[in-house]
Amino acid sequence: MACCYNSPRRLEKSFVLDGVAVSTMAQAYSIMRPKLWSAIPPYNPQLDHHSRRYFRSRVVPPILRKTDQDHGGTGRDGWIVDYFHIFGQGQRYLNRRNWAGAGHSLQQVSGHDYYNSNPKAITTGLNGRFGYRRNTPALRQHTSVFGEVTPFPIF
């Protein structure tokens, strides 16, 4: 079971982190006609595990055999778009960048756990030494005319 375990750091690193490269590639391919590559991969419902029961029902497989879609099917835009998304120039460029580790800094790879990786101790409290704000000169000199309401030592 240990071989199937994915740590959060490994999951974060396997995610496409180089947003600048993806944005540049998407802008470059957006003006191309026909539109063969997109930053969002084409959706193939036959490969979606949520719709697996539908495609294995009694009625659907004969229709898929008639339309020659019984070997995994294609996305909405056809097999050429699926092929180009996997083996096209834009996808090959992004794959080479991710295999080489380009765009992966420690902050990006740490991802969601980075904010809590090195917490600093709060020694003075959130609102100053006495725990509440002192925004007027009189409150900075004397804490309150009614006395202190805290059991902790103030001075």
From Swiss-Prot:
Pfam families for the chain: SPMAP1-like
Organism: Mus musculus (Mouse)
Protein name per its UniProtKB record: Sperm microtubule associated protein 1
